[in-house]
Amino acid sequence: GGTSTEHKISIQTGFAVAEAIKGVHNLEMINLEKEIYQFPYNLLDSDLVFNALHGGDGENGTIQAYLDLHHVAYTGSDSKSSKIAMDKNLSKLIVQSVDILTPKWILIKIDPYTGIKLENYKTPQFPFPYVVKPSNEGSTYGLSIVHNESELPAAIGFAAEYSNEILIEEYIPGRELTVGILGNRTLPIIEIKPSHNLFDFECKYTKGMSKYIVPAELSDEMVWKISKDALRIYNTIGCRHYARADFGPTEFI
């Protein structure tokens, strides 16, 4: 489960993985509810750790670095690429550096003790609406859509409950596309159609709240471009084994 806000989601993933591989391998499920310094030592005798943790130490490179230190094999990306991929600001900078389009954004850093912004806050140089979200959270925790200046302080405060680094990003309405990568091969692109205007926590994890179209109805050219860009991101960050990349509306891509 882990100690992150996505504890319950991690447990769901763990049970799904266990169901998929039971009878094929000797399996021990471990519900990690403690800090990293209380990591279960019996895990260090494993041939392979299948990391099913979402968010926090499970995705930000901490668990990965711990397992590397003890020479334990594990699934997923290494500590360096995990840290990069979990940091939305850093990953967007890397995506931008290889000429892949990403929505415009600014980063706000906040002192965790005083709540004072550590950098001079400048109004974003793009029009409303904005997406305001923590820079290192998943499952849309702390995320808000802001339509005008008066809504911005509350949205920043909400995001600050989850992180001291907050992204204010331009909101681009349109299709929600995601592409999985396994090994060094892209999987069929999925289009997600949530019941709400936003693919929020409820739509992600409540049965029947979203429709998934597989494969997404896209031109061959668009499939090629999205798949190519997903692999470029994957390889540039240095991911391994598996990953997923989300893309906005095809008009933007």
Q: Which positions does each model-derived feature cover?
A:
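Conserved metal-phosphate-binding beta-hairpin within the catalytic cores
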Residues: E170, I181, Y234-I253
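Phosphate-binding site of ATP-dependent enzymes
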Residues: H147-K228, T250
